[in-house]
């Protein structure tokens, strides 16, 4: 899976919000 490290995208979960449940 592609985990893109983005300050705007990655909040709270440690991974990007797109990959967050």
Swiss-Prot record:
Name by which UniProt lists this protein: Ferredoxin
Subunit structure: Monomer.
Essential cofactor(s): [4Fe-4S] cluster
Gene3D superfamilies cross-referenced by the UniProt entry: 3.30.70.20
Example of a GO MF term: 4 iron, 4 sulfur cluster binding
TM ranges: none
Source organism, top-level taxon: Archaea
Binding site for [4Fe-4S] cluster: 10, 13, 16
Keyword check for Membrane: no
One Pfam short name: Fer4_2
Keyword Magnesium: no
Keywords for this protein: 4Fe-4S, Electron transport, Iron, Iron-sulfur, Metal-binding, Transport
Functional note: Ferredoxins are iron-sulfur proteins that transfer electrons in a wide variety of metabolic reactions.
Annotated organism of origin: Pyrococcus woesei
Domain 4Fe-4S ferredoxin-type residues, every copy: 2-21
Cofactor binding note from Swiss-Prot or TrEMBL: Binds 1 [4Fe-4S] cluster.
